A protein has these predicted regions:
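Actinobacteria-biased recognition of intrinsically disordered, low-complexity terminal regions
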Residues: 1-3, 118-119
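STAS-typified acidic loop motif
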Residues: 3-34, 53
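Residues that form or immediately flank small-molecule/cofactor binding pockets and catalytic motifs
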Residues: 14, 86, 109
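Amphipathic alpha-helical interaction surfaces in cytosolic regulatory modules
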Residues: 26-102
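Acidic phosphotransfer microenvironment of two-component signaling modules
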Residues: 30, 109-110
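Short acidic-hydrophobic, aromatic-tinged amphipathic segments that line or gate anion-handling sites
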Residues: 101-109
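Generic C-terminal helix-cap and adjacent flexible tail
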Residues: 110-119
Length: 119
């Protein structure tokens, strides 16, 4: 992965938390996607993808989110996003109506609570 994006992973019970900081673009999306999906065990109920520290995302990053959502759905797992409202990433995801496919929360604790409520 290029130095544009940093990925940190953490398990919280049966929820995997992935935080992406920096820029997500065509130069690093393949590695980022591989690492994200490998981090989600079959026993996990959900992946919470925290993009609150992501400063930039291009169409390849958007594709990564749609692809991850489809793969997780096939495994009967949930994907939730954490995105700062009115940020660049938030505006881009709103422009492509991401919330129609993947639930978006403004805060990490909201996302974790929603996962708990759905299980």
């Amino acid at each position: 992965m290029s130095t544009l994006a940093r990925l940190s992973l953490e398990s919280q019970g049966d929820v995997e938390l992935a935080k992406v900081a920096g820029e997500v673009d065509a130069s690093n999306v393949a590695d980022l996607s591989q690492r994200l999906l490998a981090a989600v065990s079959n026993k996990a109920r959900a992946l919470v993808l925290d993009l609150s520290e992501t400063s930039y995302i291009d169409s390849s990053g958007i594709g990564l989110i749609f692809d991850a959502a489809a793969r997780l759905r096939n495994r009967r797992q949930e994907l939730r996003l954490v995105v700062t409202p009115r940020s660049f990433v938030g505006e881009v995801l709103a422009a492509v109506s991401m919330e129609r496919s993947v639930p978006i929360d403004a805060q990490l604790d909201e996302a974790l609570r929603a996962v708990d409520d759905s299980g």
